[in-house]
Each structure stands twice: as C-alpha cells, then as structure tokens.
C-alpha cells in the first residue's frame, strides 16, 4: 500500500461519515490471547467518539504534507512516516482481525472488571462495505478510580463523582484498513508486543544472509549487535530488501566499494 492508496482507503470514512458506525472493544490485561470484549456505550457518547476519531484519522493521513509510507522492516528515524507492519504479527494485534470478522463478541462485564483492567482500546469505524480499526493504548492517567476524589459541576455547585470514569482522547498508535496494518507511533510499538524479539528474529536472517555469501569472517560480532534495536533494524532491512544481495554483486566489488566510499572508509 502506498500513500495514494492509503488516502483513498481512509477518505471513504470521511466522505461517508453519516453511513459509518462505531464500536469500541477492550483488550484486557492478564487475559493472554483471549478475544477482545465489546464495551457497551450509549449512543450519544458513541457519536462523540466517531467525530473525534474520524477527525483524528484525517489529521494523521491528510494534514501532513511530508508524510511517507514505509515498510516497518525497513523503518528509519524519519518523523513523518507511517509504517506498514510487514513482520510477524503478535497475537494481541491479531485481535484486530477478530473485531472485523466477528459480530458477536462478548460484552465487557463492568461488575467483574473495573476500568483499570483495560490495556488498550480497539475502535472500529465502518459499515457492511468497509471497516477501519484503530488501536489505542490506554494510559492509567486516563482512568479515574473511586480511590480519588473527583468533583463535577452540577448547576451552581460541585458534586462528588462516585464511580470510576474514563477519559478517551484523540490519537492512536496503529490502524488497520483494507488488510494493511499501519504503525503511527513507532516508539510505542518498540516497547510493546515483544517487538524487539520479532526484530531480532528477522535481523538474524539478515546476518545469515551475509554469512551465506561469506562476506564476514566472524558472524558472532554481528549477532552481538542485534541486542541494540537500532542495529537490529538495519539487519532486518538486509533480510527483507537488500539490493546488493538480490543483485548477487561479488564480494570483492562490495569490499572495494566500502574501501573507497568516503563515509565508509575505515569502518
């Protein structure tokens, strides 16, 4: 999926705003690979969520003139990019497909679970024709528990809020549309889902590819670098899309290039 295709996919939800519905699901803590549960939300609040997140999608994709779309396996440090998740997908992220394919997921029982048991939200926007699902982590600062004292305005006075309540802001870390899972917040992904292990696994394939052509004498030196995700990402690029390896360039030409190229000399 390139940027033009992505804009076309996302624009559907903007152009068909009135025909798009919204459902919200929760991924619970300490539930392993269990399916997400649906959160029962009143219609007025759902309409507010739809407005917030359709606008947030628009800002993410359309309001950034320098935006690019890259594969996650070849990610770099550029700021204005969305990353297509082209690596092994963790089980928690696979629940996004569950939301799209299943209409009768169980509801969240608030008598058994408090709001602090929610790890992340899945916001599904769409209709029978097309869906987009947003993945949003839920920080504890957005959950207000009964242990605190919170007041709300009531006519001319303040009254105590007795129940837990949840603040849902705009913004999200990932979204899936038309079968493509895209990462918005790369830092969040790197800290979650065992992402570093996934990158190391893919990067090890890159080291193996270098070893196969006998370009280095000691691959253990390269394997030690994989504990640093910055270097692991670079070897992931080698495994997935190295033009040098794909072209079968002889080792002596590779070495000669490295010896003569200004920024590589002496490395």
Regions found by a protein language model. Name each.
Residues 32-213, 232-267:
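Acidic, low-complexity, intrinsically disordered interaction modules
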Residues 2-53:
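Charged, amphipathic alpha-helical stretches
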Residues 200, 216-225:
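The feature represents the first ordered module of a protein
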């Amino acid at each position: 999926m390139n940027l033009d295709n992505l804009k076309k996919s996302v624009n559907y939800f903007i152009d068909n705003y009135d025909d798009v519905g919204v459902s919200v699901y929760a991924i619970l803590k300490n539930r392993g690979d269990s399916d997400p549960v649906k959160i029962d939300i009143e219609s007025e609040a759902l309409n507010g969520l739809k407005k917030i997140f359709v606008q947030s999608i628009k800002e993410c994709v359309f309001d950034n003139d320098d935006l690019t779309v890259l594969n996650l396996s070849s990610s770099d440090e550029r700021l204005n990019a969305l990353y297509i998740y082209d690596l092994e997908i963790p089980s928690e992220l696979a629940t996004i497909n569950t939301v799209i394919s299943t209409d009768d997921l169980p509801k969240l029982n608030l008598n058994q679970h408090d709001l602090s048991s929610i790890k992340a939200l899945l916001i599904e926007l769409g209709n029978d024709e097309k869906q987009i699902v947003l993945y949003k982590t839920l920080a504890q600062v957005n959950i207000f528990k009964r242990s605190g004292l919170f007041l709300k305005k009531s006519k001319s006075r303040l009254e105590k809020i007795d129940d837990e309540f949840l603040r849902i802001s705009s913004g999200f870390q990932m979204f899936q549309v038309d079968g493509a899972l895209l990462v918005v917040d790369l830092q969040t992904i790197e800290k979650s889902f065992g992402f570093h292990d996934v990158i190391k696994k893919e990067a090890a394939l890159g080291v193996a590819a270098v070893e196969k052509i006998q370009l280095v004498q000691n691959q253990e030196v390269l394997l030690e670098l994989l504990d640093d995700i910055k270097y692991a990402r670079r070897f992931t690029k080698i495994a997935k899309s190295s033009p040098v390896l794909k072209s079968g360039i002889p080792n002596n030409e590779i070495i000669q290039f490295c010896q003569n190229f200004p920024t590589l000399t002496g490395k």
